[in-house]
Amino acid sequence: MNETLIRAYYAAYNALDADGLAGLLAPDVELVSAMGTQTGRDAYLETYRTMTGLFTDVMTPEQIAVNGDTVTVTIHDSLTAKADIADFMGQSLKAGEELVLRLQGQYTFRDGRIARIAITPLA
């Protein structure tokens, strides 16, 4: 069940389906990432819209490990700048330039929805 929800999450994320994402998230979802900690569905969606406004952002789950209510995902994240970006995570990018990140996402589920997301870089 949780693997199905994770696959739906990535499908919605990559399809720019904010409503689909919202339906998968708990109202008080917590997102912890390089951009800090956001709490609540609206805060998550604001971060999502910021990222997808700056980049064509395609996240591909490479490995999915389910352990009860926690799912750990190894992610290949391809970010292509839509315009020149002076500073993103300490880097400047020109329009059309791609940044590839290897990430780990840890997703915690509660009542059939994603309640916590922690995204960390992999070496």
Language-model-detected regions and their locations in the chain:
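A short gly/proline-enriched turn/hairpin at secondary-structure junctions
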Residues: 28-39, 51-54
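Short, well-ordered alpha-helical segments enriched in acidic and aromatic residues
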Residues: 5, 17-28, 32
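A beta-strand edge to alpha-helix "cap/lid" segment located at domain peripheries
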Residues: 1, 49-123
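Short, flexible segments with low predicted structural confidence
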Residues: 15-16, 23, 37, 43, ...
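Short alpha-helical functional segments enriched in proximate histidine and acidic residues
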Residues: 12, 20, 54
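Hydrophobic pocket/interface hotspot
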Residues: 9, 20-21, 29, 40, ...
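Short, aromatic-enriched amphipathic alpha-helices that serve as compact interaction elements
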Residues: 1-16
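Structured beta->alpha junctions
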Residues: 10, 33-36, 63-65
